[in-house]
Amino acid sequence: MSTVIAVVGPTAVGKSDLSVALALRLTEHGLPAEIINADSMQLYQGMDIGTAKLTPEERRGVPHHLLDVWEVTQTANVADYQRMARAVIDDLHAAGRVPVLVGGSGLYVRAALDELDFPGTDPKVRARLEAELAEQGPLALHARLARLDPEAARAILPTNGRRIVRALEVIEITGGPFTATLPDHVSRYPCVQIGLTAPRPELDERIALRVDRMWEAGLVDEVRALEKAGLRDGFTASRALGYAQILRFLAGECTEEEAKEETVRATRRFARRQESWFRRDPRVHWLPYDAPDLVDRAFALVCEHSDLCFRSATRDEQS
């Protein structure tokens, strides 16, 4: 079975740039590569600035898949993403191309790469929990989750009502902890996972600079436009980092500067959770984000831990 490459790690560490550079390097070696998005918020149409979605120019001619597939009013569903991602992976393999999965949404990465089956839903249980979320707020439900499944609570942001509700729903339906539905790391495809890491002070600074750039690039105006398209009604998209804070500003619940400062704080907290998630996966090969030979080292990992480079060399000898 053909290999998948994944580039993972916390936000603002440089995953997208590395994925493009690595795809180009693979293509140069006769291994045409294409990129599959594994950032849950980049799946949404129009959420460009706040998700740091690469522009067409920044993609440097490398085909990208699973960007802009959902409207902002649609609730994210990891099982739907799993079906889409696996279909793209299988299509690329059939075409003789190398899939490069990139993103920091840990559950989405695992859904694409691993043997994971997601429990079904119970509309009555879901409706009751969503009503409790609306009445009590996410912090109260997160405290309940912490009592029932401490490991799941550590992995889910206390403000992420959607994921808290889903975890509580699974616990109620299955009678077991939510984390029991995430078994040991069993790969569906041969995979080389490359993780980018940065010292915390440097990553914190990169996050602050990124938020500054997003504001300068017009994030507030982007949110205003998406609000007209139904962003407030989107159960998932309205809670995205930056978007949730600006929606509060537009509603008069805080100042713009407070929204910006909270975006920085919330993003830093999220980055810590992302790194903790990926650190638990022993298959990830970690590289420093600022290594001067980063692309060379990433390509070397691909050659060392897969047969891709051997296949490329064999084709060269036969041609």
Curated annotation (Swiss-Prot):
Its EC number is 2.5.1.75. Its cofactor is Mg(2+). It catalyses: adenosine(37) in tRNA + dimethylallyl diphosphate = N(6)-dimethylallyladenosine(37) in tRNA + diphosphate. Keywords: ATP-binding, Magnesium, Nucleotide-binding, Transferase, tRNA processing. It holds the Pfam family IPPT. Residues 39-42 are annotated as: Interaction with substrate tRNA. Monomer. HAMAP family: IPP_trans. Catalyzes the transfer of a dimethylallyl group onto the adenine at position 37 in tRNAs that read codons beginning with uridine, leading to the formation of N6-(dimethylallyl)adenosine (i(6)A). This is tRNA dimethylallyltransferase. The lineage of its organism: Bacteria, Bacillati, Actinomycetota, Actinomycetes, Streptosporangiales. The gene is miaA.
